[in-house]
Regions:
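Charged helix-capping and loop-helix junction motifs
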Residues: 128-137
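Active-site phosphate/pyrophosphate- and oxyanion-stabilizing loops and adjacent acidic/basic residues
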Residues: 137-138, 161
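Flexible glycine-rich beta->alpha loop in the catalytic core of nucleotide-sugar glycosyltransferases
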Residues: 119-120, 176
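Active-site hotspot residues in diverse enzymes, especially metal/ion-binding acidic/histidine motifs
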Residues: 170
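Flexible, Lys/Arg-rich cytosolic regulatory linkers and terminal tails that connect or flank
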Residues: 78, 116-117
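A short acidic, helix-capping loop that chelates divalent metal ions and anchors anionic groups
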Residues: 120-126
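Conserved N-terminal beta1-alpha1 strand-loop-helix module at the mouth
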Residues: 1-75, 82, 87-113, 144-146, ...
């Protein structure tokens, strides 16, 4: 049984935000079903606790780039992170960023979902060539029971619909939720 919704719209913070509350409000207004805190300068434990209390009932994940620890409803790991050795609670989500099918295959052994991409040019990866959308299609066929969330340049409804049509279980974006 998947811990994810049938279709996820994942809002990822930019590396820095002026107001995490305003960002969350905007992301939720644009339809985000999950928030991922990926901050260059992590919040203090006190700030994080107060923010989490204000946003009780909203699913949010802690990105490994924001620091160690297990906070929120889950943790998202980079492709180069070591897989976790324990899960704080059975309902706690683990996700992983993947940039190819080999990384994705490894993620299926321990993660609850994976981000796969990037599929379009992005400001966060300006020097890296995007993956062809056929990679997403192949990934969904190879791992039909594993939730794959497309990431990278999903800034418009037509791009999002392409990901859905190819079988992605959702999309993750920074820019889409800032518009």
């Amino acid at each position: 049984m998947s811990k994810l919704l049938p279709w996820e719209q994942v809002a990822v913070t930019p590396l820095s935000v002026d107001s995490l509350d305003r960002w969350a409000e905007k992301a939720l207004a644009r339809g985000a079903t999950m928030l991922v805190l990926r901050l260059e300068v992590p919040l203090s434990m006190d700030e994080l606790w107060r923010w989490a209390q204000r946003w009780e009932g909203v699913r949010w994940l802690w990105h490994s780039r924001s620091g160690p620890g297990f906070y929120g409803h889950g943790k998202h790991f980079t492709a180069s992170d070591t897989p976790p050795t324990h899960r704080p609670h059975p309902s706690y989500l683990f996700g992983r960023s993947c940039h190819n099918l080999l990384e994705l295959e490894e993620a299926t052994t321990w993660a609850d979902y994976a981000w796969l991409g990037h599929f379009y040019q992005t400001a966060s990866h300006p020097l890296q060539a995007p993956l062809p959308l056929s990679t997403l299609e192949e990934a969904v066929k190879r791992f039909p029971n594993f939730p794959i969330i497309a990431i990278g340049g999903f800034t418009s409804p037509d791009r999002i619909e392409k990901a859905r049509a190819l079988g992605a279980r959702g999309f993750a974006s920074i820019q889409y939720f800032l518009a």
